Amino acid sequence: MRIATSYEMCAQCCCAAAKFADTLQTKPRRSHVTPIYTIAAISLGASLGALARYGLGLALNAIFPPLPIGTLAANLIAAYVVGVTIAYVGTVPGLSPLWRLFMITGLAGGLSTFSTFTAELFSLLREGRLGMSAGMLGLHVGGSLALLMLGMLTIGLLRKSSLGIAE
């Protein structure tokens, strides 16, 4: 039951993020990007990201307790989101700057968790588990870099494919 609940929570967060993204205009009026809209975009993204991170922890950390997979998944997904967003936002002229703030500063920032990763790494080091610590460090840092690049590549491939993404 607990796993189903966390999956549902992640799905609801993703749906809410998609609905908010649909409301962002592709040709913003100057008045559209006000401090209150900026705060709202970042806050909503961060809230959804943090809830998704919590859900991933509930769903995945019990699978292999020596390595908190939920934290790893959160960091890797956040890196992918950043890569997709950088590639997409950089090629769509006139896209509201709120989109980037919502996705990168808010959603990916709330989803990724350097502090939790650091605490888990410290715990492994304190237990003398140097091999597991090195593996965890490599997975988080190397995996995040790889998924950021994969996110950017995804947008590039979608643009070239018959599926396409609107320019």
UniProtKB/Swiss-Prot annotation:
Its recorded reaction(s) are: fluoride(in) = fluoride(out)
Q: What does the activity regulation annotation say?
A: Na(+) is not transported, but it plays an essential structural role and its presence is essential for fluoride channel function.
Q: Which residues cross the membrane?
A: 32-52, 69-89, 102-122, 137-157
Task: Provide the alphabetized UniProt keywords.
Answer: Cell inner membrane, Cell membrane, Ion channel, Ion transport, Membrane, Metal-binding, Sodium, Transmembrane, Transmembrane helix, Transport
Tell me the InterPro entries matching this sequence: FluC
Where does this polypeptide localize? Cell inner membrane
- The answer to whether the entry has keyword Membrane is yes
User: Principal localization?
Assistant: membrane
Which cellular component appears as one GO term in the record?
Answer: plasma membrane
HAMAP family per the record?
A: FluC
Q: PANTHER family from the entry?
A: FLUORIDE EXPORT PROTEIN 1-RELATED (PTHR28259:SF1)
Q: What is this protein called?
A: Fluoride-specific ion channel FluC
